[in-house]
Amino acid sequence: MEAGYAEIAAVQFNIAGDNDHKRQGVMEVTISNLFEGTLPAEGGIYDARMGTTDHHYKCITCSHQRKQCMGHPGILQMHAPVLQPLFIAEIRRWLRVICLNCGAPIVDLKRYEHLIRPKRLIEAASSQTEGKQCYVCKAVHPKIIKDSEDYFTFWVDQQGKIDKLYPQIIREIFSRVTYDTVVKLGRSKNSHPEKLVLKAIQIPPISIRPGIRLGIGSGPQSFHDINNVIQYLVRKNLLIPKDLQIVRGQKIPLNIDRNLQTIQQLYYNFLLDSVSTTATQGGTGKRGIVMGARPAPSIMRRLPRKEGRIRKSLLGSQVWSISRSTICGNSDLHLDEVGYPISFARTLQVAETVQHYNINRLMPYFLNGKRQYPGCSRVYKQITQSVHDIEGLKQDFRLEVGDILYRDVVTGDVAFFNRQPSLERSSIGVHRIVVLENPKISTFQMNVSACAWYNADFDGDQMNLWVPWSVMSRVEAELLCSVRNWFISTKSSGPVNGQVQDSTVGSFLLTRTNTPMGKNVMNKLHAMGLFQTTQTDPPCFANYSPTDLLDGKSVVSMLLRQTPINYQRAPTWYSEVYAPYMHYNKQDISTQIRNGELIEGVLDKKAVGAGSSGGIYHLISRRYGPQQALKMIFATQQLALNYVRNAGFTVSTADMLLTPEAHQEVQEIINELLLESEEINNRLLHGDIMPPIGLTTHDFYEKLQLNALKFPDRILKPIMNSINPETNGLFQMVATGAKGSNPNMIHIMAGIGQIEINTQRIQPQFSFGRTLVYYPRFALEAQAYGFICNSYIAGLTSPEFIFGEMNGRFDLINKALSTSSTGYANRKAIFGLQSCIVDYYRRVSIDTRLVQQLYGEDGLDARQLETVRFETIMLSDQELEDKFKYTGIQSPLFEEEFSRLKKDRDKYRQIFLNVENFNFSQLLTDVRQVPVNVASIVKNILLSSASGVLPFDEKTILQKYTMVKTFCKNLPYVFINNIQERLQTPIPVYLKRAASLMRMLIRIELATVKTLNITCEQMSAILDLIRLQYTQSLINYGEAVGILAAQSVSEPLTQYMLDSHHRSVAGGTNKSGIVRPQEIFSAKPVEAEQSSEMLLRLKNPEVETNKTYAQEIANSIELITFERLILQWHLLYETYSSTKKNVMYPDFASDVEWMTDFLENHPLLQPPEDIANWCIRLELNKTTMILKSISLESIINSLRAKHPNTYIMHSVENTASGIPIIIRIYLRESAFRRSTNTRMATDEKIAVNVVDKLLNSTIRGIPGIKNANVVKLMRHRVDAQGKLVRLDNIYAIKTNGTNIFGAMLDDNIDPYTIVSSSIGDTMELYGIEAARQKIISEIRTVMGDKGPNHRHLLMYADLMTRTGQVTSLEKAGLNAREPSNVLLRMALSSPVQVLTDAAVDSAVNPIYGIAAPTLMGSVPRIGTMYSDIIMDEKYITENYKSVDSMIDML
């Protein structure tokens, strides 16, 4: 009878007690000896019943040798119980909540019934139990004291009498606890507290603490250090009497007491890390033992960290053999090929099973052996099941069917190619090997266009390559991991590969119109030569004579006709920046390809460059597949490179030199910048710089200098006037997008400008007031702070060179420091989202818990999208009617059609105008990503059919309209199935919404007025193609979309964090690159956020367009504390007297005059009788008061209202220039306590506290708003004619700090358009759905143009808000979202703590996701493994055919 099998559904964690250890143990350790002679000592810690790691003897338990024996645990019977070191806190909780006399609970269990199970015992133990009387035996519960000197010792304080609780006493107490009490306190029966005190401990198997015996017999031996710990434990245990009985309150001998403590400490060291080599550490009472010069190892030490068992062995994947080398470029190789050195090919072996169909192919390998390539190294003989070295075979050895031949790698084998760090799934791709026969080559070679998959370059990068062994592995590798699958990026939905650098420039030069000297005009033979290396079907040149001339466009069109597409877009070559300085050929300012024919324009980065979304290769991939796109990239690359080799292209120093006139003009521009900088210096010296509120004078001065020293756009004029754009190689590389940018060109030819480090000029850190040794102290000229006047071609002076190196060093250091942070952030994201998998309904769920009702809200794969334009969005009502309303036939159907188009337009506007209003910088646009480009399909159908179609009758037009209407109605059934479509079952609302954008586009592109020249047959073909492409664009079942989202966000976020420190001549942002992402993903509360902002629109439309009024409102909401208005303050101790004509402190003698005037002018504000001798004298900042429109009267009124125990006097507000406004605040006796002997010290403390309260008093504004400035917005609105109008003159208030509720209470603020960057503030006021939207918008705002497809952002937001609260991607957030997935949380971090908590709670871990099945040794249910394959073995057996029968059939 065969044993059945099943998958493990769940794993339960429990605390192991004595019975568990005894049941699992195969023997009892009784002695500490290791060996007796050459064999392990029986009953010793190396007893052969626990396994073997030695080839001299077998395991007694399983009779296996060391390679087959898994090991078996033993037990050590303790003479005295020991506490379980992992659960000391749990032991203390139980001692606090149960009676030490009868074991009954001391607390009222009903008080904790409402809590979740894991929290009950914790809450009960945290309550006050000392002195409580037991409900059962009436005993008074003592105070439980934790020994500060010994981690494992507890004391009880019973009315002043302190007794020690030995483990034996604790065990007796816990034995009286009933299972009912355990369950009511939230613990499982399997976690009974009696298990926390052990009488029998488990000894691990030999296999996890192996020993190495050097020599035979009594030769030297080396054993694992943990064996020494076990030896000590056994020896100390033997020193304890077997019949030792300890009674509570009884004194025991000191030597036994010490031995008990030592045993407990040894058991702790055996399980957990030794904390120190000293007696104690930090007062914790944990003592460590030392083995030689290092702390003793432990069992739990093997779990955590990168080198631990979990991350290194269980989660990590290892291969038998792998090769690694430096990579270099080789454009002769196809993108899916990799050049492999022959020395590597002869070392790395491929296992191939001999079959009838391949024995003749494998025989040459077998005969060559190791002598000649291609050969083999060994053979596995199926009959004998043995492996034979190829060089030791006998002459009569025969290669037979079923044998396995380990042959050399040959051209055509598939191999995995990988570069670390593997931040995206394209970092591991499958290539076809091309063996490089040259023995001098020892590097991997790859096409330069293939680098984008791996984010690699050729500056010394190394990559790994390994070959799958089995046939199944090779087939799976080619189908699942082929680089053609990675051609479209999951992150950006655009193509990853394309032309780079030389081939981009070559494509441009080849396709230009009127190239100088006619370099891209060639005869038939030259054109044929360009196609020699393209590896495509050569075009037909039979129609051309040898004297006919072909231009580059014609040659490229011959290649494009093999994959006919339609393309129209402005090239990168044409730029408005260059237009004033150069002449553009009209035929080169727009690239147009019609049915594979390059009609006009050039091919540059926008058309054929790497990562060009909507480019030529993207269109080819969408229509003909990614494999054809890769072939076209290679073919175009070969054309371009062959042309460049023949025509020539170079960049020389002559391309970088300016003419004398241009150089003079550049110097004039630089001198103007330096002059403006000098004027700012003069303003600083004369005190004329008035900083805005929130900035110091120094900060504002630096900001003015940075703005003044930026190169203006007109610096391009002398550069462009001194070069010839038609022949200048440097300019052509920049203009075509091949390499470089305008700032690079300016740095090389004109000047470098201001060097900035972290958005600041070079600071004087060399010494006090000096930036470098070359400049004097307190120098003010711009050159002393990093302004470089020279260009790279002109050469740099010594200080200029040092300034440039400062910036480079800063970038290097930041990259090194940020790598660890971003790497860990990536790992947390992977673990946080890896359980999110698409099910059969295209929902995203964690096991059975729903995360998204439909993936990405539309169920589409991010790789299957392309950008299209919705024509109706920007049209007014009249324009829409003129363009889309069909009036040829009077029918209510066409009125209905136009009404539907108008509703679609208005719905689109409503949705994305709301998005615009509630985001900082996301404006409405009519461009969206959709799975089907309907206009392209229509154009292709029309171009592929006969032209000159006659107008159709009314019946045909109505029939086409009905077809489109029915198709749009049934489109959501694509998410369900054809059966439901035939039955016309109701469609869920969320599925209708998922298809709404696509239905809008179909109605626009297939409107009646646009399809008059289409037949019904063509319309049917168009609709079928739309449905096919839409179906193919849906996300696959079992897709691990959580990991895809983590990779797609983490990789660009990593780059964003690194790039945030890199500054150019244009300056950069002042936000730290890592702070804001951490705030978002860590779900920090409002008070912990450092960079929260608000955008406030004004309620009154008239005020919204007036900057002055807007600034007044901004001033009114900005939080102004009294401290911000003060220049300086003094706390004085002096006797007040109204008749006194002077004051105690001579420095303030002038105060007497205004104080006298104050008393005369304010007869009702006379000093009170209880005025004290403490006075606070303050000088106000008049500049701040003027800028913030704060009057002295408002300040005084606010202070008097908030501080009634004071008497306030002040000078007049309109003082002369240079004379400050002074306020004196006298404290009253009521503010102090009753007089004591220490009156002076006490009063001083009280006075200081009053000063603190005064300074923090709010004068005006909303709490939380640290700063408020007026900003100009760009927004859209719909006018009366239905036209979408862009408004550029709207002013809003941008704040530093957030308080949505406070802003809503202000009558000037529009409460419906308040935008806050704070996720916590949004959550508190608007709820979880608003917080979800805020997470999406904030990630998009932070990442900007580097942001991934919005589906990945939705994945983040939905996961973080799934529980109804905003949870972080940190460990705490994972615990909240997946509390039952112990294995996943253990794999992330702190495995010992996670396992301990799981055992205490008796947690049950369902096996789902990725980490849990991997740790259990099974394959996760994702991808192609998501669906079970059912095989009909009976059918296969009945229809099995042998090779002979198949040959007979043929």
UniProtKB/Swiss-Prot annotation:
Gene3D superfamilies in alphabetical order: 1.10.132.30, 2.40.40.20, 3.30.1360.140, 6.10.250.2940, RNA polymerase ii, RNA polymerase II, clamp domain, RNA polymerase Rpb1, domain 3
Keyword Transferase: yes
Induction and repression of expression: Expressed in the late phase of the viral replicative cycle.
Its biological purpose: Catalytic component of the DNA-directed RNA polymerase (RNAP) that catalyzes the transcription in the cytoplasm of viral DNA into RNA using the four ribonucleoside triphosphates as substrates. Forms the polymerase active center together with RPB2. Part of the core element with the central large cleft, the clamp element that moves to open and close the cleft and the jaws that are thought to grab the incoming DNA template.
Catalytic reactions on record: RNA(n) + a ribonucleoside 5'-triphosphate = RNA(n+1) + diphosphate
Entry domain remark: Lacks the typical C-terminal domain (CTD).
Keywords: DNA-directed RNA polymerase, Nucleotidyltransferase, Transcription, Transferase, Viral transcription, Virion
Subcellular location, record wording: Virion
GO molecular function, one term: DNA-directed RNA polymerase activity
Biological processes per GO annotation: DNA-templated transcription; viral transcription
Main localization of the protein described in the UniProt heading: virion
EC number: 2.7.7.6
Protein name: DNA-directed RNA polymerase RPB1 homolog
Organism expressing this protein natively: African swine fever virus (isolate Warthog/Namibia/Wart80/1980)
Superkingdom in the source lineage: Viruses
UniProt subunit comment: Part of the viral DNA-directed RNA polymerase that consists of 8 polII-like subunits (RPB1, RPB2, RPB3, RPB5, RPB6, RPB7, RPB9, RPB10), a capping enzyme and a termination factor.
Gene Ontology CC entries for this record: DNA-directed RNA polymerase complex; virion component
Xref: Pfam families: RNA_pol_Rpb1_1, RNA_pol_Rpb1_2, RNA_pol_Rpb1_3, RNA_pol_Rpb1_4, RNA_pol_Rpb1_5, RNA_pol_Rpb1_7
Annotated family: Belongs to the RNA polymerase beta' chain family.
EC supergroup of this enzyme: transferase
